[in-house]
């Protein structure tokens, strides 16, 4: 909207200023109106070493980490599909941009449906289904010949990638209830899961950059997409092992519902 009224540079500056003013205003509202309870530090040690060791020894901790890492790698990398569509399939810049923005419309749908599905069949089963959809969708993107007439296959596959990756992301910590984590250990477990699982955000761009520099054009993108697909397969395997290890706990949770 701003770029239609003024030149592109001024439009971008206006957008930045508007976002900055909104954030400053929200910060001031929180500062003046949010009343936080007085913080009282627990006399216990900040890091409980025995609890930390207990969490580290649990296989579920590392399975959950793998599930987070393998699904979040896709969340950090899907935007490479847009330049792939424009460069290989000859899609216009408008179609490429629309394909990118399309993810934000699919996000609430994927999260909404996955939430309801998790209540019916369990969070880890939703993750497993999401990984399957993710893998099939990526294979569709990789195997589709670079012809503009076949761009619709890429768009459909993109919808599958978007829906599955956001569905899986919404279950990252929901599956913790299926493991044998006592309540007092969930915080410690999260302290391990978060930095390791979300380290995909630092690693995925490095791998993408290496692939695109080593193999130019279509081949570079396809090599990277194949790596992402393999990572998703690893996530699915970790998910299936999780399902096997948490079977009794999941049955107990389902009985309570």
Q: Where in the sequence are the language-model features?
A:
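Intrinsic disorder in cytosolic terminal tails and internal cytosolic loops
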Residues: 243-257
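A membrane-interface helix-boundary motif in multi-pass transporters
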Residues: 3-20, 210-232
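Helix-to-loop junctions at the C-terminal end of transmembrane segments
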Residues: 111-123, 212
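C-terminal transmembrane helical hairpin of 12-TM major facilitator-type secondary transporters
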Residues: 123-175
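Extracytoplasmic gate region of multi-pass secondary transporters
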Residues: 59-111, 169, 204-205
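Juxtamembrane intracellular "pre-TM" segments in multi-pass secondary transporters
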Residues: 36-64
């Amino acid at each position: 909207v701003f770029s239609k009224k003024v030149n592109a540079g001024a439009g971008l500056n206006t957008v930045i200023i508007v976002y900055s003013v909104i954030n400053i205003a929200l910060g001031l509202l929180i500062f003046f109106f949010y009343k936080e309870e007085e913080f009282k530090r627990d006399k216990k040690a900040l890091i409980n070493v025995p609890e930390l060791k207990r969490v580290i020894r649990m296989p579920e901790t590392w399975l959950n980490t793998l599930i987070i890492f393998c699904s979040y790698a896709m969340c950090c990398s899907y935007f490479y599909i847009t330049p792939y569509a424009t460069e290989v399939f000859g899609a216009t810049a408008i179609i490429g941009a629309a394909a990118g923005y399309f993810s934000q419309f699919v996000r609430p749908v994927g999260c909404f449906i996955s939430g309801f599905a998790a209540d019916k069949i369990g969070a880890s089963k939703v993750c497993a289904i999401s990984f399957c959809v993710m893998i099939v969708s990526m294979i569709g993107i990789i195997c589709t010949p670079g012809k503009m007439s076949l761009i619709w296959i890429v768009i459909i596959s993109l919808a599958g990638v978007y829906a599955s990756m956001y569905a899986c992301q919404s279950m990252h910590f929901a599956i913790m209830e299926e493991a044998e984590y006592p309540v007092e250990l969930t915080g410690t477990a999260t302290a391990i899961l978060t930095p390791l699982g979300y380290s995909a955000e630092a690693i995925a761009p490095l791998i993408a950059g290496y692939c695109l520099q080593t193999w130019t054009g279509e081949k570079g993108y396809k090599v990277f997409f194949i790596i992402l697909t393999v990572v998703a397969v690893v996530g699915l395997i970790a998910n299936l092992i999780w399902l096997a290890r948490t079977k009794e706990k999941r049955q107990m949770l389902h009985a309570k519902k």
